[in-house]
Amino acid sequence: MAYQTALTIESVIKDIDSKKYLLPSIQREFVWSTKQIEKLFDSLMMDYPINAFLFWKVPKEKAKEFSFYEFIRDYHQRTGRHNPKANISGVDDIMAILDGQQRMTSLYIGLKGSYAYKTSHKRWDNPQAYPSRKLYLNILGESEDTDLTYNLLHSDYFRSKFHQKIYQKYYYFHKTQHIYQYQHIHRQDFL
């Protein structure tokens, strides 16, 4: 069994973006909840290992014998739960993910994508019932309330007076939204 060096989160995100990593048709669909995504990021922020990924290198000559799918980038509970089929024409060897799809998809959704799930007390056929949520991370310090440290929120969240107080006290919810778009900024710069 061959072992590779550790992957960086940045390289995983870039490889998903460039479609270097694809999912074989034998993979189940993305099923993680927002709480599971938050726990993954909690583990990362506490420097816990998140286990290994299992890759399957498929030579381009064999790739046409299989079906492959792309990663979900913006999960939507009603209209975006299925992975789009990958166009593999003109592609070199394919790196298929056999184990780690839930974690990789969660990393992508948490850092660049979004997660839309139905708001309670709204009709399933109402498009407004599925606000798009992004992950906000407190990378500057400890929160007094651990439930506020990581959370997938939609933009209407801070409209109530109670949530305005939280926003003022924990301003990093909004401020860190775009931090991962800048490659030259690192977590250590803020510590």
Region locations from a protein language model:
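Basic- and aromatic-enriched surface patches that contact anionic nucleotides/nucleic acids
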Residues: 2-34, 38-191
